[in-house]
């Protein structure tokens, strides 16, 4: 049987990919950030209602009934355990797995760059990320705006103070009435508005850093001590593509556990299965996570932009359909 066996990326594009990844490693070596390697599978996983995982079972000696394992959506939990153990500043280039979309900007298995800087807040980490983006993308310095500013400038509605009626009216102007009208979850509505109405309007000429996300979308970030409506979280966009998601990392174990439990309660309300909480991470936070900021960046999307390609298949050898 004849099959489509050849890579979707040209050999020259794969060479350029390798060169860019080498440059990223050099970037961190010059800053004395240590490269680490953590597991691709874990007994626990993310509780985020918007992330869907792959899972398998280990059935080796002593586990005849099977031990459930989850492929990691990010190395974050393991890397924070290293930070709590005294690793200092670290980075990783790894494979991540999400049982979600497959298309122009998505592959179920993808390459991620994640790094953590001890003693940084999210603003200082944005400075460093700006340097990396200028190196790889050969672009100008990034623009910065708050989440609130982006919403008001593009959609004319405040995401922090606007009513659900006002948010649904903004969705209606985007032709999203059928989706927005029955929606009762504020964050789901905000994410819909941001993804459809805002993302493709910012960061067209240079990357855009959007920071101060609503506190309800804090995930693993600290709440801003000056404005409890927002979290110390940022995302990065360029030419309509989300590139990265970063936090001034939450170091309070009780608060982190409460957020995981709230996620699982929400999953049950939505008819989804609750996910096993990573108590190793909670124990690491109890032992003491150093004050730090961290960010995860999609390498495939970054290289796609750097090489002027239209699809991540052009910069990956064997995407999902032919893997």
From Swiss-Prot:
Record's Pfam families? tRNA-synt_2
Q: Which Enzyme Commission numbers does its entry carry?
A: 6.3.2.-
InterPro entries associated with the record: Aa-tRNA-synt_II, aa-tRNA-synth_II, aa-tRNA-synth_II/BPL/LPL, EpmA
A molecular function (GO) term? lysine-tRNA ligase activity
What enzyme class is recorded for this protein? Answer: ligase
Q: What does this protein do?
A: With EpmB is involved in the beta-lysylation step of the post-translational modification of translation elongation factor P (EF-P). Catalyzes the ATP-dependent activation of (R)-beta-lysine produced by EpmB, forming a lysyl-adenylate, from which the beta-lysyl moiety is then transferred to the epsilon-amino group of a conserved specific lysine residue in EF-P.
**Assembly state and interactors?**
Homodimer.
Query: What is the protein's name according to its record?
Result: Elongation factor P--(R)-beta-lysine ligase
